[in-house]
């Protein structure tokens, strides 16, 4: 997998109260492209952060319905990836 494709897979880390608590258990959350697979996500995280990934779980988050100036619209769907790294390794999401 080339470097350019890897950089396009991971869009942003998800930083919330829940994901901060999960980081104590070596789990990290990322917003990823909707069309990427678990294998691609695993390869991207291992290459970018130099960690060993044990497990990747993904879910599609449905976009919310919003009203703007009386018109109903919707935000796009997006994919969330929960990545579990090996014991003793960590990812510094504040730098990403």
Curated annotation (Swiss-Prot):
Belongs to the universal ribosomal protein uL23 family. HAMAP family: Ribosomal_uL23_B. Transmembrane segments: none annotated. GO terms for cellular component: ribonucleoprotein complex; ribosome. One of the early assembly proteins it binds 23S rRNA. One of the proteins that surrounds the polypeptide exit tunnel on the outside of the ribosome. Forms the main docking site for trigger factor binding to the ribosome. GO terms for molecular function: rRNA binding; structural constituent of ribosome. The keyword rRNA-binding applies. InterPro entries: Nucleotide-bd_a/b_plait_sf, Ribosomal_uL23-like, Ribosomal_uL23/eL15/eS24_sf. Disulfide bonds: none annotated. Part of the 50S ribosomal subunit. Contacts protein L29, and trigger factor when it is bound to the ribosome. Keywords: Ribonucleoprotein, Ribosomal protein, RNA-binding, rRNA-binding. It holds the Pfam family Ribosomal_L23. GO terms for biological process: translation. Gene3D superfamilies: 3.30.70.330. This is Large ribosomal subunit protein uL23.
